[in-house]
């Protein structure tokens, strides 16, 4: 510091760093299967919780709904047969933003409900 008034710079407090910033999500889904609505619903819930997060969508193969966080596959509909619960994805994002180890989401909700 030079001692002159107005010459100091202060980093923003940690709580001002936008939650989820630095976390990148890629969702690959089957558009002909009608999974776009599920992607949009999930992306909206994630953005509500983590406004600074980067979410990218890609068209995938038949039956696909795959989610990567920072390049790591954390959910696969092809493996689980259903869709992830929002709370499980939000928890995985929280872990990623804190630098914690990510685990695969194995809990899933059924792809459809017959009334």
Swiss-Prot record:
GO cellular component, alphabetical, reads: cytoplasmic side of plasma membrane; cytosol; mitochondrion; plasma membrane
Q: Where in the cell is it found?
A: Cytoplasm, Cytosol; Cell membrane
Outcome of mutating residue 112 to S: Abolishes prenylation. Predominantly cytosolic with little plasma membrane-associated expression. Reduces cell migration by affecting filopodia formation
Record's keyword terms, sorted: Acetylation, Apoptosis, Cell membrane, Cytoplasm, Disulfide bond, Lipoprotein, Membrane, Prenylation, Redox-active center
Q: Transmembrane region positions?
A: none
Summarize tissue expression.
Among normal tissues, present only in Leydig cells. Strongly up-regulated in breast cancers and in brain cancer distant metastasis (at protein level). Up-regulated in prostate cancer cells and in the higher grades of prostate adenocarcinoma (at protein level).
Instruction: Give the propeptide positions.
Output: 113-115
PTMs? Isoprenylation facilitates association with the plasma membrane and enhances the migratory phenotype of cells by inducing increased filopodia formation.
Q: Which domain of life is it from?
A: Eukaryota
Topology with respect to the bilayer: Lipid-anchor
Q: Where is the composition biased (Polar residues)?
A: 1-10
Question: Tell me, which GO biological process terms does this entry list?
Answer: apoptotic process; negative regulation of apoptotic process; positive regulation of cell migration; positive regulation of filopodium assembly
Region annotated Disordered sits at 1-21
Disulfide bond entries:
30-33
N-acetylserine, modified sites:
2
User: Which residue numbers carry lipidation of type S-geranylgeranyl cysteine?
Assistant: 112
Please give the subunit comment from the record.
Interacts with GPX1.
Q: What does this protein do?
A: Increases cell migration by inducing filopodia formation at the leading edge of migrating cells. Plays a role in regulation of apoptosis, possibly through control of CASP3. May be involved in a redox-related process.
Q: Which family does it belong to?
A: Belongs to the SelWTH family.
Protein name (database record): Migration and invasion enhancer 1
